[in-house]
């Protein structure tokens, strides 16, 4: 970090170890304007086992690793090619301000290919602005369909001035990076001189506009090293392979470490499981709003149901996943209904809760003490959809309310509790209050 030649740092991580040292590293790097990007292994059980077997690393959960890297402001990539391509972007251009991209190619096939490959990413191709369309029309004429991604055909190939005007027309401040898709032939079996025009046009465009430009080959082997060196010397990012280029562009977004200090987990004590009723009472004291509940034998609860008239939820006790064993009965409105439901459950004691009518969504909120990474808050789709959708997001404690809200909005389920298709929206503030209260409870009981 103290070497003035260093512009970005790539890391291969098996385990983290000293968490405060990682936090100090990330903060110093951010202060110096040196972005960090990591290839963190350990997504699979096999990789975690391999890590433990040949190093002293504590593997921890992958969700915890993701949360820690996010907390540190370190980008995470999945493979070596993407790591290298990300470092190229960071070295030449620095972190990108957004995921808005443009693409220019002389083939409709390449334009379609990059559009499809970007479909499942967070990157977007903004529609052309009026200014872009005016400039492109002047440079390309009426025969070219103007769009982003752009297929500029080959009408102007070999005309460096015209190609430069067309490329420059796509460069606008709203675009974080512009891709020029070019495949170079092998110099030992082909004459590459006909590609000189596109290299020079790209360099001239960069000099004229100052825009962030990457020349991308469809396959890694189609970007010769001598061309890459020449492009980089001219301020253009040479990239091998469209998929790796897109993944690298996602990873190269502007990031910053969290201002909150990491919580280093203490040595774990023997775990003690408390009952659902006791857990809810403890959380209620911490500020979490919970349904009114009673515990007791079936007849006592049935008599209560006759007086209060519900609707109620009846639950058996002693089983974690109650729905899988028929341990939950919903929408009970009388004592007889409670008796009939309880008779089908193998339990001596029960929980009777008031039932929330017409919920917008069920949300799972969990906290795990991950010895390798810290205390991990997971928020996601709950109830029936918890394991079916696997729609969750995890962050490290302590987390600010704004960070928690951003995490909620990363969920697919967020469309529902924001009011999907004119359906009633959920109370986001109440949900955030609950998450903050649960976080406060954990912070008050870190060593228990």
Please name every model-derived segment.
Residues 1-448:
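Catalytic-core regions of core metabolic enzymes
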